[in-house]
């Protein structure tokens, strides 16, 4: 594997682009934008920070923003893999970075942690059309720089919301597409009033039937922002919210059904008394989330700048579930709702200074989370023994988190700089689990009514050092070397399904950036060494959460090449690929009633090869045609690398056309956009799961295996018209 990585590095002739669009160049940026960036700069990597990262500007998002979620919009970036329950990138979707699932990808919005405090999942479905209110995204791979929230074990996304508009504007966006997809969005800005105040907002609606049967989405969102600024001050008050009603499509399909009826969805299926199959019409997921942020950025004396942010998030909702009656009618079906009601609030802060000799940042955060988990019956009848809306579990989770960090980038010479980053993070977490809520270790710690539940109370203290070197050899070549440690607490689901340990990661990065006449290249080698990594088993618990288990030693060793080639004035080619080795050491698993050793196995959900191309053709100033290609190599859905759990590789191509239809005197910014997804109609699945169960056979346990898959849509089209006044 090491020879492959070395040869690939030497033989690569691809080219790299890692720059923000011209609107973000320092020479053209306004003072208001400079102050605005203070909010995210404390967490973001700079050009001479010794970590691999990718910046995505608003202009890059607009081209492909027709209705799909952020994971779909960034799927062509290095080491990223996305998957969608409904098969279209609308509704429930998620990303993996370097093989690490969404619970291990740190996401912040204006520096505020967005990962759910207990599950650490990122529910993009709660942010429909949020990309329309995004100014830029930075994706860091590996541990990266210190950030707020849970540790990054595969990567991090740092999102900056919309910047102020100097002039008044009004915009309308409408999208139509396959599977009855429709998106309507309106946005506005007052421009600066009396040079100090600006108000802006967006209101969006997205509806789609989805590719999978009964996987529809009904999504609504808004974004409101008020800004006050003067020469040294910027204050932003934000309120953004989403309401999602989605059909449940997270069940997947088994291998045989995948061949015969790939759009099948078992959710809500039940039998009539006459034996006919029917589907419960309210098998829905219904959740609302409100987010509030107040950010105050201030230029102080002697070159210092400060940021203080307050935030509050309130989420509440449920999924309604029909528990199927057996075909023999001996067991009566029932209906329940499983609720979440949670509050998350806190403060972030940073103090920074930049000089010719050094850059320094001091920052941190204090956050509090309260979550309620409860289930209600939605029927009444003596055959069940419960009344309407009786609770069959009633649990909670509480989490307090504090972190503080100090970063120093010191220029030893004009060519060599040293980077240091120290973080202390403290977590206090307590929770209860009832058996019906999806967990509990079975120990008698307390009760709710007649139900036994489990209590936990945990405290973690983590110290995470990072350091590195950046060397500018000449105007064409930069090199960097870095080390970073990350430590991470288990999730609620981990506690509900076992007795987990916190995990630790030591991350080593070695990179080269080349800048030449018509191409740019970034080559990055990484070695990520884990202790007690919580890995996906491929199995799910009784409420659909993915089950993870600690393993002893494991690692990820890989090479990332990210490039851009400027062919001529009309053509350019962006290319990136990742080749990696992802291994468990001495993996053991209970199989056929025995603890069996499987040796060194490939980490599940970790393809050895990920590759992307974006070929851009601009025949004139008004038209851009892009072919966006995505290859994901084969991967295992199980940690034991069972042959039946191998997910096939796939190669997908999307065609994106943007036509500038601006009409002087009517709209100076009017665009017609077309996105043809999967133009070659490939039948593929980009995610799935694996499970085992034991039965007695001839007096001895026999293990049986199964898999399930999430099929994705074939060729489908989205057509959008953006008009800005």
Task: Please tell me what each predicted stretch does.
Residues 113-141, 160:
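Short acidic/polar hinge/loop motifs at secondary-structure boundaries
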């Amino acid at each position: 594997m090491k020879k492959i990585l070395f040869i690939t590095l030497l033989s690569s002739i691809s080219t790299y682009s890692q720059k923000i669009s011209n609107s973000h160049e320092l020479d053209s940026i306004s003072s208001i934008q400079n102050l605005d960036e203070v909010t995210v700069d404390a967490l973001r990597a700079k050009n001479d920070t010794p970590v691999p990262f990718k910046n995505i500007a608003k202009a890059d998002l607009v081209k492909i923003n027709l209705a799909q979620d952020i994971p779909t919009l960034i799927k062509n970036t290095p080491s990223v893999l996305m998957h969608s329950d409904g098969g279209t990138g609308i509704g429930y979707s998620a990303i993996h970075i370097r093989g690490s699932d969404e619970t291990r990808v740190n996401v912040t919005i204006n520096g505020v942690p967005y990962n759910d405090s207990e599950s650490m999942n990122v529910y993009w479905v709660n942010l429909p059309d949020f990309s329309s209110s995004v100014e830029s995204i930075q994706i860091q791979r590996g541990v990266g720089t210190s950030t707020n929230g849970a540790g990054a074990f595969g990567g991090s996304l740092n999102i900056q919301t919309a910047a102020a508009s100097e002039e008044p504007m009004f915009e309308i966006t409408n999208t139509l597409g396959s599977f009855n997809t429709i998106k309507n969005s309106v946005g506005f800005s007052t421009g600066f009033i009396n040079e100090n105040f600006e108000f802006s907002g967006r209101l969006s609606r997205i509806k789609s039937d989805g590719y999978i049967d009964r996987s529809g989405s009904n999504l609504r969102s808004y974004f409101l922002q008020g800004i006050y600024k003067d020469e040294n001050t910027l204050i932003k008050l934000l309120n953004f919210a989403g309401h999602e009603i989605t059909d449940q499509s997270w069940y997947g399909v088994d291998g045989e059904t995948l061949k015969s009826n790939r759009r099948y969805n078992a959710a809500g299926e039940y039998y009539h008394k006459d034996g006919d199959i029917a589907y419960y019409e309210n098998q829905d997921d219904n959740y609302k989330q409100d987010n509030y942020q107040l950010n105050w950025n201030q230029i102080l004396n002697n070159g210092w700048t400060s940021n203080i942010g307050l935030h509050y998030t309130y989420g509440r909702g449920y999924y309604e579930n029909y528990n199927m009656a057996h075909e023999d009618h001996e067991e009566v079906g029932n209906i329940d709702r499983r609720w979440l009601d949670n509050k998350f609030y806190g403060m972030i802060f940073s103090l920074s200074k930049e000089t010719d000799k050094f850059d320094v940042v001091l920052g941190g955060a204090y956050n509090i989370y309260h979550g309620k988990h409860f289930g209600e019956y939605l029927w009444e009848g003596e055959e069940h023994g419960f009344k309407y809306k009786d609770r069959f579990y009633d649990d909670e989770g509480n989490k307090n988190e504090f972190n503080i960090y100090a970063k120093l980038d010191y220029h030893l010479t004009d060519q060599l700089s040293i980077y240091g980053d120290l973080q202390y993070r403290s977590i206090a977490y307590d929770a209860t689990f009832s058996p019906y809520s999806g967990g509990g270790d079975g120990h008698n710690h307390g009760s709710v009514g007649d139900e036994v539940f489990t209590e936990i109370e945990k405290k973690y203290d983590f110290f995470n050092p990072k350091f590195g070197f950046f060397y500018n050899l000449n105007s064409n070549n930069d090199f960097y070397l870095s080390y970073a440690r990350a430590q991470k607490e288990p999730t609620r689901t981990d506690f509900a399904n076992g007795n987990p340990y916190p995990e630790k990661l030591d991350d080593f990065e070695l990179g080269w950036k080349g800048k030449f006449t018509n191409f740019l290249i970034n080559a990055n080698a990484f070695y990520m060494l884990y202790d007690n990594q919580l890995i996906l088993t491929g199995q799910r618990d009784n409420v659909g959460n993915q089950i993870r288990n600690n393993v002893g030693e494991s690692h990820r060793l890989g090479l990332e090449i990210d490039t851009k080639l400027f062919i001529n004035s009309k053509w350019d080619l962006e290319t990136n690929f990742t080749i990696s080795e992802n291994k468990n050491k001495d993996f053991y698993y209970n199989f056929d009633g025995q603890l069996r050793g499987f040796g060194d196995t490939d980490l599940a959900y970790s393809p050895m090869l990920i590759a992307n191309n974006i070929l851009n053709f601009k025949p004139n100033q008004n038209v851009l045609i892009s072919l966006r290609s995505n290859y994901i190599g084969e991967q295992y859905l199980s940690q034991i690398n069972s042959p039946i759990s191998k997910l096939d590789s796939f190669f997908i191509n999307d065609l994106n056309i943007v036509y500038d239809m601006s009409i002087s005197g009517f709209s100076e910014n009017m665009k017609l956009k077309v996105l043809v997804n999967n133009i070659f109609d490939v039948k593929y699945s980009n995610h799935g799961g694996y499970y085992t169960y034991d039965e007695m056979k001839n007096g001895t346990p026999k293990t049986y295996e199964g898999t399930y898959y999430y099929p994705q849509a074939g060729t489908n089209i989205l057509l959008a018209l953006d008009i800005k006044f």
